[in-house]
């Protein structure tokens, strides 16, 4: 027996070589022995021929370690030294010599408060200590790796920096909270890595880092060490303005975008735009069209293109398809400098079963429920988060904070909220488990959503939290202290379904379905609704909006323009999916660019101009937004004219805000001498007319000017005779010189 072998006790050397010794920090590295009278250094370096200990303070050699065995175990005492010091290992390999700062000499970098909040379920910044983070310890720079895997037998970090050797960097286990960590000097930015986990049954699985801030694109799935240099923000003016804005009283016209298919480049459109391309083309386009916000479909890294991002694996990693995290930040910064907000679709309802992802992460159902009646989503064959587990709540809460704080995003739109709220969602009897009170509500998910919204609104000024919720669940946008979920807005799925159904009917039969456009006002003030025509309505065989409308091309385009006019006049914020603003003919295909060539044709140009002018009018006149959620902001003039399929109403603002009158005709009949009530006396004029030749219409209208008469009508003291264009929308307002000059539409 050599002297070196005496440094490994109780078979620890054999256990280490077999991967069975998990408390490696108690064995490897520098340790005091003989009651503090000596120091020993132990290391495990495969293929090493010689190892010397070098002082980091002066670069001098302190000692040479003895080889314990051919497998790569080395150990040795350090002469008379008894006080620990920072050191490197000078390792001689067959073809090279390397100086390696031994990671096993460093203590834990975790603090008690972080660990407590993470386990409790209230950590807002878990990404600062989990994942891969650049740190400096005793003037030594490196990457701190940390992962939650409480049921793993052993966890190692493997990557480019250790030739993917699972024995090289076994991590420190914190048994009490299930975290594993290691601080690695010498790692370079851009290094690829994974966590190598040994399960209790002995199986080994390589997993992507759940907290990775960058990942490879599919089909590869390694995590990537982030860059040290971060984007320098220049959007202070926007952020200050955002914080002072009450968005429920402000205009919000949202352009929904899937970055991979808005435009493409390459000879055959086979290449994605990168973030610089999007800065140069998407932002000016959105600005010109007058939208206030862009809503991005999910950008968290996802392996399957056909999921459109709604089955993410790297929840913290912006997809590498379009560039890195700094590129994404630069895009958002440029949007803000152009006074365009950016919202993000956020998927917290489920996650996919890709083996490198969260599924059975440490050999157990860590993030999901064990019982498939609670843990599996029947529609998408995905897994449902365990919202009752503190660490899972912290994982999701921190992720929401990460996007909003680190990327300056202006809000999140939560996908598939209905599937979170109900335990029996898309399940037959016997396929679900009731809650503790025997009900169908998912109480843990409800509590999580309330906590999420309450914390985000308190911590991050001026953001918008938006729910895609398709049921009649009460109080989605009510405050949490009133037992609501606490969202700022809810998609109005009822209005969307009813109005699109109406749109698809032949004009001659629309009179029998008049209530499909009026019914939404019966419940418009029960929630803070957002009118959304999203990607879901123009895919999976549903056809484009233009395709849904019966008739010849003239009728299709005219009807679509009138529909948009009705939508922009209806109370509630607006969202429109890309391509709909110029009446794309085919339904959306995520593998191809939008059909921009259609803009060579006048009808498509006309719809685009109409949307642009609607947005300009919408942003200019407070009556169209300031009282969206107050009944006094809207009044029907006539909601019962089903015979003519004409809808007329007034939008009001506050104080001296100019009221606007909308008249929408959903048949191809021209109505001349049509009397309409007006909210005040004096001259009125057409602010916008969707039948104008400017938009591809037949130019039926009122010559721009309407003379009000002191004849009460429709509950108004004044009225006028007007011409209502076929399949058209008129927007009327007081004909004051000041307003006309300012509108300049």
From Swiss-Prot:
One of its GO terms (molecular function) is 1,4-alpha-glucan branching enzyme activity. The keyword Transferase applies. Signal peptide: none annotated. Its EC number is 2.4.1.18. InterPro entries: A-amylase/branching_C, Branching_enzy, GlgB, GlgB_N, GlgB_N_E_set_prok, Glyco_hydro_13_cat_dom, Glyco_hydro_13_N, Glyco_hydro_b. Pathway: Glycan biosynthesis; glycogen biosynthesis. One of its GO terms (biological process) is glycogen biosynthetic process. It catalyses: Transfers a segment of a (1->4)-alpha-D-glucan chain to a primary hydroxy group in a similar glucan chain. It holds the Pfam family CBM_48. Keywords: Carbohydrate metabolism, Glycogen biosynthesis, Glycogen metabolism, Glycosyltransferase, Transferase. It is an enzyme of class 2 (transferase). The active site is at 415 (nucleophile), 468 (proton donor). GO terms for cellular component: cytoplasm; cytosol. Monomer. Belongs to the glycosyl hydrolase 13 family. GlgB subfamily. Catalyzes the formation of the alpha-1,6-glucosidic linkages in glycogen by scission of a 1,4-alpha-linked oligosaccharide from growing alpha-1,4-glucan chains and the subsequent attachment of the oligosaccharide to the alpha-1,6 position. PANTHER family: 1,4-ALPHA-GLUCAN-BRANCHING ENZYME (PTHR43651:SF3). This is 1,4-alpha-glucan branching enzyme GlgB. It comes from Shewanella oneidensis (strain ATCC 700550 / JCM 31522 / CIP 106686 / LMG 19005 / NCIMB 14063 / MR-1).
């Amino acid at each position: 027996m050599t002297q070196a072998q005496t440094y490994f006790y109780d078979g620890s050397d054999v256990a280490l070589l077999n991967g069975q010794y998990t408390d490696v920090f108690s064995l490897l590295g520098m340790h005091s022995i003989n009651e503090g009278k000596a120091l020993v250094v132990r290391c495990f370096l495969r293929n090493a021929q010689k190892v010397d200990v070098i002082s980091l303070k002066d670069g001098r050699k302190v000692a040479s370690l003895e080889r314990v065995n051919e497998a790569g175990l080395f150990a040795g005492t350090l002469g008379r030294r008894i006080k620990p010091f920072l050191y490197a290992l000078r390792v001689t390999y067959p073809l090279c010599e390397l100086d390696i700062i031994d990671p096993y000499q460093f203590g834990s970098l975790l603090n008690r408060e972080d660990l407590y909040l993470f386990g409790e379920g209230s950590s807002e910044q878990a990404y600062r200590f989990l994942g891969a983070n650049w740190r400096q310890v005793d003037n030594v720079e490196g990457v701190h790796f940390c992962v939650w895997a409480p049921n793993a037998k052993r966890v190692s970090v493997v990557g480019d920096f250790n030739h993917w050797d699972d024995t090289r960097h076994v991590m420190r286990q914190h048994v009490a909270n299930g975290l594993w960590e290691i601080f690695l000097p010498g790692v370079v930015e851009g290094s690829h890595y994974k966590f190598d986990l040994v399960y209790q049954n002995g199986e080994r699985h390589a997993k992507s880092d759940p907290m990775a801030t960058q990942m490879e694109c599919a089909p590869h799935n390694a995590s990537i060490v982030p860059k040290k240099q971060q984007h320098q923000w220049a959007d202070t003016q926007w952020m200050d303005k955002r914080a002072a804005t009450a968005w429920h009283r402000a205009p919000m016209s949202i352009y929904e975008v899937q970055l991979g298919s808005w435009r493409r480049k390459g000879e055959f459109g086979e290449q994605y735009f990168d973030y610089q391309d999007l800065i140069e083309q998407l932002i000016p386009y959105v600005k010109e069209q007058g939208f206030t916000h862009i809503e991005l479909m999910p950008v968290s890294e996802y392996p399957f293109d056909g999921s459109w991002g709604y089955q993410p694996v790297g929840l913290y990693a912006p997809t590498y398809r379009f560039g890195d995290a700094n590129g994404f930040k630069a895009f958002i910064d440029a949007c803000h400098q152009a006074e365009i907000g950016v919202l993000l679709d956020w998927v917290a309802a489920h996650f996919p079963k890709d083996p490198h992802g969260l599924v059975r992460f440490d050999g157990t159902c860590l993030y999901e429920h064990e019982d498939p009646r609670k843990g599996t989503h029947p529609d998408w064959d995905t897994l449902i988060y365990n919202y009752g587990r503190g660490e899972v709540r912290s994982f999701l809460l921190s992720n929401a904070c990460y996007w909003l704080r680190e990327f300056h995003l202006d809000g999140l739109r939560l996908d598939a909220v209905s599937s979170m709220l109900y335990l029996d969602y898309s399940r037959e009897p016997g396929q679900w488990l009731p809650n503790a009170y025997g009900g169908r509500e998912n109480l843990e998910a409800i509590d999580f959503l309330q906590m999420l919204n309450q914390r985000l609104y308190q911590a991050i000024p001026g953001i918008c939290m938006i729910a895609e919720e398709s049921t009649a669940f009460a109080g989605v946008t009510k405050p949490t202290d009133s037992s609501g979920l606490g969202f700022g807005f809810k998609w109005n799925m009822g209005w969307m379904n009813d109005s699109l159904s109406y749109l698809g009917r032949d004009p001659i039969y629309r009179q029998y379905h008049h209530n499909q456009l009026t019914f939404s006002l019966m419940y418009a003030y029960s929630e803070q609704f957002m009118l959304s025509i999203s990607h879901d309505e123009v895919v999976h065989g549903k056809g484009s909006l233009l395709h849904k409308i019966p008739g010849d091309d003239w009728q299709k385009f005219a009807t679509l323009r009138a529909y948009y006019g009705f939508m922009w006049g209806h109370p509630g914020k607006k969202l429109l999916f890309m391509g709909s603003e110029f009446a794309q003919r085919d339904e959306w295909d995520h593998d191809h660019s939008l059909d921009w060539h259609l803009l060579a044709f006048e009808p498509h140009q006309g719809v685009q101009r109409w949307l642009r002018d609607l947005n300009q009018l919408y942003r200019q006149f407070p009556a169209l937004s300031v009282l969206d959620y107050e009944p006094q902001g809207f009044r029907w003039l006539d909601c019962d004219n089903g015979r003519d399929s004409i809808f007329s109403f007034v939008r009001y603002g506050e104080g001296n805000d100019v009221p606007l009158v909308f008249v929408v005709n959903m048949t191809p009949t021209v109505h001349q001498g049509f009397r309409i009530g007006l909210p005040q006396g004096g001259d009125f004029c057409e602010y916008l007319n969707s039948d104008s030749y400017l938009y591809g219409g037949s130019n039926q209208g009122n010559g721009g000017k309407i003379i009000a008469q002191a004849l009460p009508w429709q509950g108004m003291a004044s009225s006028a005779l007007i011409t209502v264009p076929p399949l058209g929308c008129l927007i009327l307002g007081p004909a004051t010189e000041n307003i006309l000059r300012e509108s300049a539409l």
